[in-house]
Amino acid sequence: SPFHCDFGSQISIGDDFTGNFNLTILDEAPVTIGDHVFIGPNVGIYTVTHALLPDQRNAGVMRSLPITIGDNVWIGGNCVVMQGVTIGDGTVIGAGSVVTRDIPAGVIAFGNPCRVIRPVTEDDRITEVV
């Protein structure tokens, strides 16, 4: 499965990591991924953004901020995680989300922009395995 990154030297990945097809990490700043993290297909993790003003953008001005993904996080397919974001432990990010702000631990969050929907609870436990 293809994996793409800018450098790779600024990426730290914990134990038991799963990254699906077409994972792209633009690591102009540090990217820290915790233990037991699942990342779905076609996910982009971008620490860098171009300037908003045309003169700065044309001059190549960019800004980079770190991204931290906690332990036991699941990021669904086709998500984008933007610069400066922290995703807390045990959180689930729904497919197709654009994460532009910090997401706390232990919640289900999705949307564009991504927002907290509810906490992850024992009611979410799967009791019948198919």
In which residue ranges do the predicted regions lie?
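Flexible, glycine/small-residue-enriched loop-and-beta-strand segment within the central core
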Residues: 3-86, 112-114, 118-130
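Short-chain dehydrogenase/reductase
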Residues: 74, 92, 98, 108-110
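Conserved catalytic segment of ABC-fold P-loop ATPases
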Residues: 88-91, 104-106
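Short glycine-rich donor-binding/catalytic loop of glycosyltransferases
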Residues: 96-97, 102-104, 114, 120-121
